[in-house]
Amino acid sequence: MRRIVLIATNLLLVLLMLVACQKKEAPAVTLKKVVVTLDWTPNTNHTGLYVAKELGYFEEQGLDVEIVQPGQNTTDQVVASGNSQFGISYQENVVLARAQGIPLVSLAAVIQHNTSGFASLKSAGINSPAQFEGKRYGSWDSPSELAILKTVMEDSGADFSKLQIVSGVYDFFTTIGKDADIEWIYDAWTGVEARNKGMELNYIPLKDLNPVFDYYTPVIICNETLLGSDPEMVRSFMAAVSKGYEYCIAEPVKSADILLKHVPELDVELVRNSQGYLAAEYKSDAAKWGYQKNEVWRRFIDWAFDNRIIETSVISDKAFTNDYLPE
């Protein structure tokens, strides 16, 4: 009897050792490394990316995603070259790139409507582009910026040549009312910060001036080559990102805290108020987050061609796709 017990015990030990060995030898899941390059310093336009990283949405899709800021080269350049698989850019940039034969593609609209516009101190009494004549405009020197200004001024009956352009203006709070009377701001960030500071501004939303300028800004981009070589990875990335932005819409306070955890140098009040603002804007009136309409692209492309921003027109449905958004 003792012999039977001893044999049974030895067999059990052998089985346990085999199971332990199998567990040790089980191959670890290899995550595919992916880089996404931001357009600027981290802010609430990017929160969905940080949420997807923090809550494991990328890992669920088999991805190890690194979020980086642009260096000497622009985001468009590093994505076009393949040094970054994905990036945050703008509809204007994608149109300009494609007109030059650079195959960038927009995969999703981060925000459904353009939340940027022209801001001035309330004391300046500027309420319309018709009042831009004789004023100083602080420019960040983008290719389409002055053409947009010219259009909205002429639409209001004003003479664009009577607007003084001050080049290289980037910090709204140190320049407005000093170096410039009018500047172009993103209301969800700079506008929120101004309100936090108690500044009284007149703000003119760009989308209210002309439907052409209710374009997508920012957008998530990739290189067209990547869509052909690894479409499943693109689909996996976008599934995780979509889940991240849907979380931002449902949980603005928690998502703000996630952004602050990853970028602790950001102002807490600014991030939380901006996140609350964007919770209603990310998806807005679209059926789902990220969805892009052909007419929005077509309008801007036609305007850019008519105003000689681009020398050759662009096929709108080649510049963007909704195919990689989750159902």
Which residues does each predicted region cover?
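Pocket-lining segment of extracytoplasmic ligand-binding domains
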Residues: 92, 171-174, 178-264
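Secondary-structure end/capping motifs
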Residues: 228-307
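Short, glycine-/small- and polar/acidic-enriched structural segments
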Residues: 28-169, 174-185, 204, 214
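C-terminal motif of bacterial Sec signal peptides marking the signal peptidase cleavage site
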Residues: 17-20
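Conserved C-terminal helix/tail region of periplasmic/extracytoplasmic solute-binding proteins
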Residues: 297-327
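Bacterial N-terminal signal peptides that target proteins for export
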Residues: 1-9
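Bacterial signal peptide processing site
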Residues: 22-24
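Short, solvent-exposed loop/beta-turn-alpha elements that line the ligand-binding surface or hinge
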Residues: 60, 130, 208-213, 281-292
